[in-house]
């Protein structure tokens, strides 16, 4: 089991390409998406494709719930679009890091790069709790990855980097 970071998340194509990459690699993807995506006729389709709706305004126990479910699986990849949106932002969402830390599983970096028309998997990061050091590794990997729409890329940075190490739950 792993947390698969899908970045840079810059277009609607990212979703389909990342799912295809996960399936081709023999992983069973479970991906997190905003709950609005699951409204109406798309709900059963997105659920069948491994979707898990997220209320971004009230995430509550999402990290603990996903971590508990993920810890029991072996070929499962929890796919997280770390930027949380296709638009350029200031920070990545920290859920991918917190899920991996809580479930005691590695973070696998994956990418799509529009300028080179390539995609694939990068290094595996084992979260140490030193968020800044771990994010330095992640930033180094994504430095030359532009996404399908490079102008929408968000630099990998978490608000948590300024704080103390992230504690692990008991």
Q: What is each residue range found by the language model?
A:
Residues 160-170:
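C-terminal amphipathic helix plus adjacent low-complexity
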């Amino acid at each position: 089991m792993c947390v698969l970071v899908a970045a840079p998340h810059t277009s609607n194509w990212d979703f389909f390409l990342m799912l295809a990459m996960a399936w081709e690699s023999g992983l069973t993807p479970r991906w997190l998406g905003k709950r609005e995506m699951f409204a109406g006729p798309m709900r059963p389709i997105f659920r069948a494709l491994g979707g898990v709706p997220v209320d971004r305004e009230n995430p509550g126990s999402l990290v603990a719930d996903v971590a508990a479910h993920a810890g029991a699986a072996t070929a499962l990849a929890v796919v997280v679009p770390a930027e949380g949106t296709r638009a350029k932002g200031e920070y990545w969402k920290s859920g991918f890091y917190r899920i991996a830390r809580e479930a005691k599983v590695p973070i696998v970096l994956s990418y799509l790069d529009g300028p080179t028309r390539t995609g694939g998997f990068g290094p595996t990061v084992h979260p140490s709790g030193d968020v800044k050091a771990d994010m330095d590794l992640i930033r180094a990997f994504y430095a030359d990855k532009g996404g399908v729409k490079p102008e929408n890329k968000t630099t990998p940075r978490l608000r948590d980097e300024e704080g103390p190490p992230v504690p692990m739950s008991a």
